[in-house]
Design a protein with these regions (language model features):
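Serine-dependent carboxylesterase/thioesterase catalytic core
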Residues: 90-96, 122-246, 729-738, 756, ...
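Membrane-interface motif at the C-terminal end of an N-terminal transmembrane signal
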Residues: 19-46, 220-229
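Active-site-adjacent alpha-helix of alpha/beta-hydrolase-fold enzymes
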Residues: 111-112, 220-222, 226-233, 237-274, ...
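Alpha-helical transmembrane segments of integral membrane proteins
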Residues: 554-867
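Preference for solvent-exposed, low-hydrophobicity sequence contexts
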Residues: 323-569, 574-577, 613
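Short, surface-exposed "cap/lid" segments of acyl-processing enzymes
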Residues: 68-131
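Hydrophobic, mid-to-C-terminal alpha-helical segments
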Residues: 275-277, 284-315, 319
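Classical eukaryotic N-terminal signal peptides for Sec-dependent ER targeting/secretion
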Residues: 1-18, 818-821
Length: 867
């Protein structure tokens, strides 16, 4: 007895601890990130969005959607007359977004443009539909985009192409429009697509089959046609990084869809002069990013050659630059006096006195040279030639500065550069400054281990490069804490070789409270080592951390594992797997109740002698499937993309177990016990009275049962699921209050209904919004209804509880015997099947839940087993 109490207390403590960690993980995911260093974009005049008329048949077919132009001030009068003189850009909004979000790009373009180069921004109003969570609208939205492009181009006499800028799911629509038939859309009218926080690889949540099929069609088309019918296209994908809680940066990758010859995917933290993470909304109005985008677009439309190679060069310059020494300019220099030769490994030179400095390249003992300069000229030279390479330098933080850098790998110079024997640095004025780092011992290997910390000390080291060969998993997050006896602001650069997600020490930028001032100079600097995209391959390169320090000072670097950020990464990358594990746990719990009807749902969660083996079985089967079926969809999604680790199924299983334990305890012990106490006499009396009026009872019963079906037919499948949940709740209250033993099972079944209802909330919201625009019509008359079939099947399975209550058919009795005999095996098999077929397609859970409803009806409502 004492052991049982202790075990129960221990289990409850584990449940509570798991839920607390889950909530802490959510908090960490939402709030533990870098500050928002983006500046707000403001409009100088009142923004206006004139609505543009489309052909009558288009307006009739898509009454929920509209096309608008953006204008300010005097230009609005021309826009109202559909008179445009600039270059057309169509902004395609994302999930639940407003067409007014175009104002940031439109306003900045209006201010930066002139008569020779202007951008005319247009925006689509999708009625703020939940297109990322409800696939029934995606095809209609894509069709409307095609019609909008055709209408916009009809306003221009000479412009035959348009630029597409897609935010969130709008970026996917900008790619999907190329699948439209030729009479609706001409692929040659679009040559550049820019996407902001668009999940290209897969949907954030696989809510329904329409989303899955839409992604499959679009991505397969792009894989097949990228170098065929799409060979004129250039694509830029921007990801927000750590601050974007809605779209993970790995989903914005173009890996496998395009190649690097005509596409770029980059995190905003790596974009020059942005160097900041953006959240899902902020990426639209972040001033630094808007400026970079506008400058790039204005330069692109000025080019006479509108080919993909020219466009790509401009995009790389603004979003992912690299040093191209071939762009250097031959020049001739005169010298007032002999240059000073630099032999030190680390030195900082200032322009107090105009002077020239030379760094020898020939026979140098150093492996690498890195130069950070402000207002200085950099040259490569030999006895015959001097090459000005100042314009090839790359910008580095802080944002509002002329600070730039260049690095030379002396041992691997190109053949064309081996002719030069020195680097010349010319300080042009008193504000000129150059920091030079000549590195002999290039790298220091740091082996990171989980839940471990390391402390490194650097004395009189100007440059330090730390390489982390064991940093390869998404759940590995480490805190970097740099302290020093110097007040100089060090520059820290975190580089990930397989992804454009470089991060600079953003505290060297500006504080959010006062964007125009410099940060104070505390003695401690902090940042995180965190991956946003898993390592699919390394080619011998690993993540690295570069520290550019003051060689006259000493520094202490602490690297510590961050458990809070580990929890945050679990939420960010694995939360979408939770519905399937919730179903799995309920299956196991229900199997226990079939064997012992008196067990409450909460008590089944304490049967660890069953749950632990099932969780281990799932973890082992995961590993076996990964080994035996490496090309299966399940393995490609969870393992090949770098997301899987062995303990993942165990963590998700016990998280689901803890959540159901808490929910079932509240529902069963607190709510239903209270209802039983309050209503038992009344419901018993009403039940006895109704039993004497069988015809009247059957009529009420069938009217009640017909409501979910009618709701499905007259409204939508999502409405039907929610109606079915309400009916199941009433059934538990009615039958469960009278029959305590049956209530135990019906409570578990109610949780299955609740899971279905939650998965269908977005469809319910979509139909309510469509009613407000188009009237009280069934969803199937307005758009495809992904939940229609599942609602019909689940409702029919629910009805079996009542139709089988009078059944004496032999086949039903045989089926009941089979279900009882192989109960545990059938339900655990069902739980395992859900893991491999529904983890990434959770909309298929309704098929398995329908079987559960049939199972309940056969076992508990067929006469021979009635309570």
């Amino acid at each position: 007895m004492t052991f049982g109490i202790i075990r129960s207390i221990f289990q409850n403590v584990v449940f509570l601890l798991t839920i607390v960690l889950f909530l802490v993980g959510i908090w960490s995911h939402l709030y533990r990130h870098e500050s928002n260093y983006c500046e707000m974009t403001y409009m100088f005049e009142n923004p206006t969005y004139p609505r543009i008329s489309l052909p009558a048949d288009v307006e009739t077919r898509y009454p929920r959607y509209a096309l608008h132009s953006y204008c300010e001030g005097v230009r609005c009068e021309a826009h109202r007359r559909n008179q445009f003189i600039g270059y057309p850009v169509l902004f395609i909004v994302g999930n639940a977004d407003s067409y007014r979000q175009v104002r940031s790009l439109g306003s900045v373009a209006y201010r930066m443009g002139d008569k020779q180069k202007q951008l005319d921004y247009f925006s689509i109003d999708f009625n703020e539909e939940l297109s990322a969570l409800f696939g029934g609208v995606l095809d209609q939205q894509t069709e409307f985009v095609a019609h909008a492009i055709k209408t916009i181009l009809s306003f221009y006499k000479t412009k035959k192409t348009i630029i597409l800028v897609g935010n969130s799911i709008g970026g996917l629509l900008s790619r999907a429009v190329f699948l439209q038939p030729p009479d609706r859309f001409d692929p040659n009218t679009v040559r550049l697509i820019i996407t902001q926080a668009t999940p290209h690889q897969a949907a954030v949540i696989h809510a329904d089959s329409y989303i899955m099929n839409f992604y499959s069609r679009v991505n397969q088309y792009w894989k097949d046609e990228w170098n065929n019918s799409l060979k004129h296209l250039t694509l830029l994908s921007l990801a927000g990084g750590d601050r974007d809680h809605l779209v993970r940066s790995d989903l914005t990758s173009l890996n496998g869809l395009t190649d690097e010859s005509r596409s770029i995917d980059v995190l905003t933290s790596a974009v020059p002069y942005v160097w900041a993470s953006t959240d899902h909304r902020c990426i639209v109005w972040c001033r630094q990013l808007v400026l970079a985008t506008t400058r790039a677009l204005l330069e692109i439309i000025q080019e006479k050659k509108q080919d993909s190679q020219t466009t790509m060069q401009i995009l790389k310059q603004y979003f992912s630059p690299s040093v191209d020494l071939n762009l250097g300019i031959n020049t001739t220099l005169t010298y007032k006096k002999d240059p000073t030769i630099i032999t030190e490994s680390s030195i900082s030179i200032h322009g107090k006195e105009e002077n020239d400095y030379v760094i020898p390249l020939k026979n140098s003992k150093f492996h690498r040279i890195i130069i950070h300069s402000t207002n200085a000229k950099i040259y490569l030279r030999n006895t015959d030639v001097t090459l000005d390479i100042t314009n090839t330098l790359l910008p580095i933080p802080p944002t509002y500065s002329a600070r730039k850098m260049i690095r030379f790998d002396i041992k691997q110079l190109d053949d064309s550069l081996k002719q030069y024997d020195s680097i010349l640095i010319r300080l042009e004025n008193k504000k000129s400054q150059t920091d030079i780092y000549q590195i002999e011992n290039d790298e220091q290997i740091v082996e990171l281990s989980a839940f471990d910390s390391q402390t490194l000390k650097f004395n009189q080291a100007g440059y330090v490069k730390l390489v982390f060969p064991t940093l390869s998993n998404l759940w590995q997050v480490y805190h970097i804490h740099l302290s020093s006896n110097s007040e100089n602001t060090p520059l820290i650069h975190f580089h990930v070789p397989w992804s454009n997600e470089d991060q600079y020490n953003l505290i060297s930028l500006r504080p959010t409270s006062s964007p125009t001032t410099n940060l104070p100079k505390p003695l401690a600097r902090q940042m995180r080592l965190k991956l946003h995209r898993p390592a699919l391959f390394t080619n011998g390169e690993y993540p690295s951390l570069e520290l550019f320090l003051n060689s006259k000072s000493s520094y202490t670097l602490e690297i510590s594992y961050s458990f809070l950020d580990f929890l945050s990464q679990l939420i960010r990358y694995y939360i979408y797997l939770l519905p399937t594990f919730l179903f799995t746990v309920l299956c196991v719990s229900y199997s226990l109740q079939v064997d012992e009807v008196t067990l409450r749902t909460y008590r089944t969660m304490l049967a660890w002698q069953i749950h632990i083996p099932v969780a281990l079985l799932i973890a082992i089967l995961y590993k076996i499937v990964i080994i035996l079926f490496p090309s299966s969809t399940f393995v490609v999604n969870i393992h090949s993309n770098g997301y899987y680790f062995f303990c993942l199924p165990l963590i998700l299983y016990f998280l689901s177990l803890s959540l159901w334990a808490m929910i079932s305890f509240i529902i069963d012990y607190l709510i239903f016990d209270f209802i039983h106490t309050m209503l038992y006499p009344l419901l018993t009396y009403v039940s006895n009275e109704l039993n004497q009026q069988q015809k009247f009872t059957r009529l009420i019963q069938w009217i009640s049962l017909s409501l979910p079906l009618m709701v499905t037919l007259l409204f939508s499948g999502s409405n039907g699921h929610i109606g079915l949940f309400i009916l199941a709740l009433l059934h538990v209250v009615w039958r469960g209050t009278i029959n305590q033993r049956l209530r135990r099972v019906l409570t578990t079944v109610l949780l299955f209904h609740g899971l279905l209802a939650v998965l269908n909330l977005t469809g319910f919201i979509m139909h309510i919004k469509s009613i407000l625009i188009q009237g009280l019509y069934p969803l199937l008359m307005i758009m495809p209804d992904p939940s229609f079939l599942s609602a019909i099947c689940c409702t029919t399975a629910f009805y079996l509880r009542f139709t089988l209550s009078q059944s004496q058919k032999q086949i039903v009795q045989v089926l009941k015997i089979i279900f009882l005999k192989y109960n545990r095996s059938i339900l655990i098999l069902l739980a395992v099947i859900s893991q491999f077929f529904c983890s990434y397609s959770m909309h298929y859970l309704w098929i398995l839940i329908s079987f559960i409803f049939i199972h309940v009806a056969v076992i508990f409502f067929v006469p021979s087993h009635r309570d």
